UniProtKB/Swiss-Prot annotation:
Gene3D superfamilies: Enolase-like C-terminal domain (3.20.20.120), Enolase-like, N-terminal domain (3.30.390.10). Mg(2+) binds at D242, E285, D312. This is Enolase. It is found in: Cytoplasm; Secreted; Cell surface. NCBIfam families: eno. SUPFAM superfamilies: Enolase C-terminal domain-like, Enolase N-terminal domain-like. Its cofactor is Mg(2+). It comes from Nitrosomonas eutropha (strain DSM 101675 / C91 / Nm57).
Length: 428
């Protein structure tokens, strides 16, 4: 009864008003799995390729009708009749059908939509919550959220070089209390911005996007917001920064426009280290460009014992690249973005490889999101311990937090909130 009898794709709209793809997978039993695919703004060069139409007369060339056609035609024909519970085999079939190194022929967006929809259908067929279907009986850890409070870089129309300034409520007793903490700090930050006559418009991921004179101003204001909301900076609420440094790395230097600086790798690492000394920063993402492996080595040697160093662009959720990084002792964490690699199986493999190497895995959204909540189930199903899914505003972000709250309720007394133990690779 779990045989696939129909696959249907359509073009829908993401949180930035751009087209993306959604797929339905129908099983013989009548069960339906539906999944939609996110899209990034800061896209690494190593990511699997999403297929866009290039027709400037529709959506400025960003349409996905070709990807939809590939699902409704070639992909549908290939997986019709297959058992939806055989996720690894189906994903392998999709990869081989595409035949390219980076899924550029059929489109990683087309392949991923089907891969995720298959898993959802199989979970429904098995009468299991999706997180339980993915992870089994030991799936009980609620992840610590990285909550975006201030947007910059390509995620906002302001002068900040850094892409995200986040809070990490690692000292709270439960996911529910962590979400409450995030909402309260977010509200307090709004008040502080109003007092400074700064705008409270939000960026792609729901964080505020004010025009600060320097990058560091964001950190000082976040610490103030944490304190005035009634929480302890550091012990209860830490800070994370996504530099997205590949975006301002040119000609071998890091160009910080808002600060008027042009820094070598060593100088930029000193710059970040000075922040770590002054503020309760526990996580830095893409602190060095994906092109600067030597710089990554220096950063890891300098801060890797006390700060989580998350590789996003450099690893691209790709086990081949992650293995290279592990062998060279680069970073100590990987950001997991399902659309960077293009199938559920490869996503789960990347999480497993990271854990086996003592790296942490942070399951992440993209700046262009949909109402799909599957990353919440992946985070719990794999016991990934950390999730990054935006601010406490915009329904496309809150959908994931609300799904985590439902999962916590479903787990009942078995549920455990990861808290500070989520950063197991760091020395106390």
């Amino acid at each position: 009864m779990s045989a696939i009898v129909d696959v249907i794709a359509r073009e829908i709209i993401d949180s930035r008003g751009n087209p993306t793809i959604e797929a339905d997978v129908l099983l013989e039993s009548g069960v339906l799995g539906r999944a939609s695919v996110p899209s990034g703004a800061s896209v690494g060069t190593r990511e699997a390729v999403e297929l866009r139409d290039g027709d400037t007369q529709r959506y400025y060339g960003k349409g996905v009708l070709k990807a939809v056609e590939n699902v409704n035609g070639e992909i549908s024909e290939e997986i019709m009749g297959l058992d939806a519970t055989e996720q690894c085999f189906i994903d392998k079939t999709l990869i081989e059908l595409d035949g390219s190194e980076n899924k550029s022929r059929l489109g990683a967006n087309a392949i991923l939509a089907v891969s995720l929809a298959v898993a959802k259908a199989a979970a429904e067929e098995s009468s299991l919550p999706l997180y339980r279907y993915l992870g089994g009986t030991n799936s009980k850890w609620l992840p610590v959220p990285m909550m975006n409070l201030i947007n910059g870089g390509v995620h906002a129309n302001n002068r900040l070089d850094m892409q995200e300034f986040m809070i990490i409520p690692l000292g709270l007793p439960s996911l529910r209390e962590a979400v409450r903490c995030g909402a309260e700090v977010f509200g307090k930050l709004r008040t502080l911005l109003h007092k400074k006559n700064l705008p409270t418009t939000v960026g792609d991921e729901g964080g505020f996007a004010p025009g600060f004179a320097h990058n560091e101003e964001a950190l000082g204001l976040i610490v103030q917001a944490i304190d005035e909301a009634g929480y302890q900076p550091g012990s209860e609420v830490a800070i994370g920064v996504d530099c997205a440094s590949s975006e301002f790395f040119r000609d071998g230097k890091y160009h910080l426009a808002v600060d008027g600086l042009s820094l070598t790798s060593a100088q930029f690492i000193d710059y970040l280290a000075s922040w770590v000394e002054k503020y309760p920063i526990i996580s830095i993402e893409d602190g060095i460009s994906e092109q600067d492996w030597d710089g990554w080595k220096l950063l890891t040697e300098r801060l890797g014992q006390t700060v989580q160093l998350v590789g996003d662009d450099i690893f691209a959720t790709n086990t081949k690249i992650l293995k290279k990084g592990i062998n060279r002792n680069i970073a100590n964490s990987i950001l997991i973005k399902i659309n960077q690699i293009g199938t559920l199986t490869e996503t789960l493999n990347a999480i497993e490889m990271a854990k086996c190497a003592g790296y942490t895995a942070v399951v992440s959204h993209r700046s262009g999101e949909t109402e799909d909540t599957m990353i919440a189930d992946i985070a719990v199903g794999t016991n990934a311990l950390q999730i990054k899914t935006g601010s406490l505003s915009r329904s496309d972000r809150l959908a994931k937090y609300n799904q985590l709250l439902r999962i916590e309720e479903d787990l009942g007394d078995v549920a455990q909130y990861a808290g500070r133990s989520a950063f197991y690779q760091l020395k106390p």
